[in-house]
Structure formats: C-alpha cells, structure tokens
Design a protein with these regions (language model features):
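Residue-level signal for secondary-structure boundary elements
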Residues: 26, 56-60, 103-106, 125, ...
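Conserved aromatic
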Residues: 38, 140-141, 167
Length: 192
C-alpha cells in the first residue's frame, strides 16, 4: 500500500467515510471507511454490509441503518480525493480512476491542484487531470529555483554568455513568472 504525504499529513489511500445521517444527527458515529479499491470490486454494492440491511415494504426495497433504522447515508469525511469526488455517486463512478491515479502518484498532485484551482469542487476529475497534464511544471524548492529551471527550459538564458549569468536577478524573474503560474506546496502550474 502506498502512503502519500501532503503538508506533513500521511494519507494512505483515497477513501470516503460513508455514514448514517440519522445517527450522525443524533450524535452517534455509525459508518465505514470505503477506499477507492474497495469501490472498484464487483461486490461494491455490499460495502455497506454490517452498516445497513435491506428491508422490503410494499414492494419498496431500502437500505436501513442497523442501529437506528434510518434510510439516509451520506459522505461525512474523505481523504486524498478532490472535493468534486467527495460524494458517494462521484466517488463510486470515479473509483477506478482514483485508484489508478493513486498508484501512479499523480492523485496527490491533483488534490493539491484542486485545492488551489477549484476549492468549490466544480471541476470533474477528468478536467483536473487534463489541466494538470497540460500545465504542470514540476516541483521546486523555491520560486527562484523554479525561475532558473524555467529560464533554462525555454531558452531565455541561451543567448547570455556564461560569465554573465550570475548577474540575472532570478528572484525578480520569479515574481514576474508567478503572474502566469500558480504554486502550492512547491508544485507549479501554468495558468490557463
């Protein structure tokens, strides 16, 4: 199992905590952590097993809480997923993609990007992944290091003689670049 760390907090894998809303409103926690990998399994519908039971009344089948017989379940908490996937429907629809992105290590970057670019959670996981793919410029210790790397990458320093490169003010260049880029936790993306 891969552990991802964001700002010093270790997150094992993408997951939601699905719980009974009635129990929650009455001060009791009755729920279960469901990981993206569990949600991709064929018996994903059974992940509420132990939390809920199926009950049929007048040809209507509903999931009922085993503790209070409430019939509403909701996501109470989530970890290592963008806000747009923090509801049960989106989580289950994107579970396979979330698990794959987590295994490649890209999911943590998408969570960071979503926090900066989309705090309201309006962008889909596909839109975030596309934005990341088209605009990511890597991880750097400081804005100055990013500016140096960017200048070398785009060839801004190619025409400057080697002995004159020490006179380039990369701190100022970094301030100018950050009008066109955004950064969070040492990662840089071009604004689109």
């Amino acid at each position: 199992m891969k552990t991802t760390t964001i700002n010093g907090t270790a997150l094992d894998e993408p997951a939601i905590w699905l719980g009974c809303l009635s129990c929650y409103n009455n001060g009791r926690l009755n729920g279960k952590w469901i990981t993206a990998e569990q949600a991709t399994e064929p018996e994903a519908a059974e992940t509420l097993n132990g939390l809920a039971k199926l009950e049929t009344v007048n040809d209507y089948t509903a999931s009922r809480c085993r503790k209070c017989f409430g019939d509403e379940f909701d996501v109470m908490d989530y970890q290592l997923i963008p806000k747009s996937c923090a509801n049960a429907k989106e989580f289950y629809e994107n579970a396979e993609q979330l698990a794959e992105l987590h295994n490649t290590g890209e999911l943590a970057l998408l969570v960071i990007l979503a926090g900066v670019l989309d705090p309201a959670g309006l962008m889909s996981l596909d839109e975030l992944a596309e934005y990341h793919q088209n605009s990511y410029y890597g991880e750097h210790d400081t804005d100055k290091n990013f500016a140096e790397h960017y200048a070398d990458e785009v060839g801004d320093t190619a025409s400057v003689p080697e002995h004159m490169r020490n006179y380039i003010d990369y701190d100022y260049y970094a301030k100018e670049l950050l009008y066109d880029f955004m950064s969070e936790a040492g990662h840089y993306w071009r604004n689109q």
